[in-house]
Amino acid sequence: MKKSIISLLSLVSAMLMTIPAGAQITGVELARKSQDPNQLLTHENDKVIREIEADADIIVCGGGLSGVCAAVSAARHGSQVILIQDRPMLGGNASSEMRMGIVGVKEDQCQEAGILEEMQCRNFYYNPLQRYTLWDDVIYSTVVEEPNIRLFLNTSVEDVVMDGEKIAAVKCWNSNNYTKYTISGRLFLDCTGDGILRLSGAEYRRGTEAKSTYGESYLSNEKDNFNTMGNSILLQLRKTDEHHPFTAPDWAYHFTDDDFNYDTPKSTIPGIKLNYKIIWRAHDNNFWWMECSGVKFDTIHDANEIQYEMKRIAYGVWEYMKNHPDGRAKDYDLDWIGSIPAKRESTRYVAPYTLTQDDVVSGGHFEDVVAYGGWTLDDHNPNGFMNKGLASTEYIVNQGYGIPYDCLYSVNVPNLMFAGRDISTSHMAFSGIRVMATCALIGQAVGTAADMIIDKGTTPAGLRKDYISELQDVLEDDDCMLPYRWRKVSPLTLSAKTAAENEPMRNGIDREWEGEDNGVYAAPGEVNLTYTWEKPVAVSNVRFIFDSDLKVRGKRMRKLEATTERVPMPSEMVKAFKVQVRVPADTRKQRKLNAADPAAGEWKTVAEVKDNFRRLVKLSFDLVQTDAVRIVVDETWGAEKAHIFAFDVK
């Protein structure tokens, strides 16, 4: 307990120390410089609304998981980034405001990694009780630890400034600090979901295409329509020892059994899963099926009306379940109810390519693949909660279907890219790629691409033409698996000698796959994970993939938050380790002892890590001439041996 408290305090302390680098603090400093501390401010000498200008290479609009991953990936590769978020916390639908579970691929071997997995393991480390408000700050820490990111919270994009066909700047408003911002950049990434940068004139779609538009057999509508999936307000429950009846507000709906006669699970069809309202159990229920109609309401412009309607539904549902005579929810109390509806669907930009049902069903074999999905084609009924019967229909698809780069940049605004649920897809394909783990992968891909565009002085279209293979290599090196290919291992790693049992560390497959382990085990203190060369080589970087147990589904936040059970770190992950190099002895001693003799050199520690919680670890150190490199595991997170998927040297 004491250690966890210290870790949490360290997290908060690190956050507070990092804040002064942010653009909002810059605004405060500017205001302080312009006022006399000994002068009373009045209507004659005070400015009610400040106006501040800022600029960066890359402007990311939207601080959900796709925006966070885009900003962090671009910043880590060297670009100057501004991240704009209209809420007081990051995370979007995954934040404490909305509490939607992070889902994506359903198959163990295809589970998402990259920055998303890093944040989820960080959450285990700092937030083992899985409290949502602390999860907000875990995401926050991931962002503010990056020196190349300036974060603008509570800041809404209101307009754009155009320079011909390109976006030159965004106009923003922060009602929290009464400040107007003009934020300029070279590239603009729309990760808002609703597509606010449509203000630029970028082409987009809203609604559902006709079945014939892309030949999508899972659709039934013969004509285009404005129907979308609806928004949801979620509930969280608390286990209780006593039953106390629940009284909903007078303005809530009041339901009876007659309202749910059609909501009984029925047999499924092969390849199709039929989902109904889960009104018969309280345990393990996050109430995703409480959904406001995307037919009756516009999910963007009717947001206030949807909020009220969803509150009426949510209170009414809980009153019905809690007080039901069969006692289905008697052991639970309502612990939390959302206030902001989480959105599923609104806007989809138009890119050079539009992902469709057939692309998903066939596996998404694209030359320019940069991300992947694995959620079913999960098309929610547009009538939402008030539909009598089905809540959603899931069409089962192959796991790990590819998502191409050509879906991720505007067809008519040359410096606009996008990530998350506003990328270029049909409505049916969207029903699978909209979930947050997939959106996070897309965000990391777009952020990495954006940095490369800045670095090479090209455009999104130019990157597709000239550098797509390089982008794919960088993504794989950053622990983003891509379908139908494996990571390229560095030539220096492949040129080394190592024991036969160590070969999986350099096969480029950084996870269990098709029944193959693809890893090695090492007990603390063992020195057998070693690469050697006949002649000294120059080494300054190492890369590891440790086992974070991608199979564990418990990384998503709990549906019952009030539990006191702590979530442990993945036991086979390396907690502490050293990287050591062997410095060759002088030439005469080598000739005397034989250069192949391990005693002919001295082992030197060039890097040491403690309390590691990352799956991907990259370390740099001063360039050294060496004929051997090894990792020495000092400690695991509980297992007798650590499990390591990759060990690369450069």
Residues of each region from the PLM?
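Aromatic, loop-rich ligand-recognition surfaces of beta-strand-rich domains
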Residues: E512-A600, T605, K610-K650
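Conserved N-terminal/central alpha/beta ligand/cofactor-binding core
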Residues: T26-P37, K47, D55, S73, ...
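Beta1/beta-strand and adjacent pyrophosphate-binding region of the FAD-binding site
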Residues: R50-G64
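Bacterial N-terminal signal peptides that target proteins for export
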Residues: M1-L9
